[in-house]
């Protein structure tokens, strides 16, 4: 959050009237405070939804920035007065309640994975002892077959669909 807040301050010092918007996807609840920006946006199906929210997103920030965005994200003229609930308020609120604990568990698991894979000789980012600003952990296998075998091994030990064997395919939107 400190680096993002510093960028926000630099932008505001350079250009008055500019809105700084941060897509905080996977970054929510990973630090003591959220980054400073005019507006933070994110998905409820990731960190803040705690695995419970089936859909949705959020906008938060300065009153003016949120007001301007609200007229683009809802029906014309309704702004922040309404929002899509789709009959899912219960799951969304349960997700918000559970999210800090679930994100903490994800961070611990990422630290552990980084430590284990570092000890096994793999290149990881972030390193096990580095500060994290999200719940993403990268492990570089160095070759496609290693990644494929890893995914298949995880799936074979999973509680759900362990009989399924994941196979690579040309997924739209990804070149590699």
Q: What kind of feature is each model-predicted range?
A:
Residues 1-104, 108, 117, 121-125:
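Conserved PLP-enzyme active-site core in the AAT-like
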Residues 118-176:
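Conserved C-terminal alpha-helix-loop-beta "cap" of PLP-dependent enzymes
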């Amino acid at each position: 959050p400190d680096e993002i807040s510093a960028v926000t301050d630099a932008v505001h010092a350079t250009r008055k009237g500019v809105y700084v918007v941060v897509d905080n996807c996977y970054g929510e609840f990973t630090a003591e405070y959220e980054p400073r920006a005019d507006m933070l946006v994110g998905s409820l199906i990731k960190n803040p939804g705690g695995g419970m929210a089936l859909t949705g997103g959020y906008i938060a920030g300065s009153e003016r920035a949120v007001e301007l965005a609200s007229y683009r994200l809802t029906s014309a003229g309704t702004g922040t007065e309404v929002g899509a609930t789709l009959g899912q308020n219960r799951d969304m609120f349960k997700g918000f309640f559970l999210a800090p604990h679930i994100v903490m568990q994800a961070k611990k698991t990422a630290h552990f994975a980084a430590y284990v894979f570092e000890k096994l000789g793999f290149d990881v980012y972030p390193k096990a002892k580095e500060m994290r600003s999200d719940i993403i952990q990268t492990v570089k296998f160095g070759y496609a077959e290693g990644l494929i075998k890893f995914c298949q091994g995880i799936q074979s030990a999973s509680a759900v669909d362990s009989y399924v064997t994941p196979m690579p395919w040309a997924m739209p939107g990804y070149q590699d």
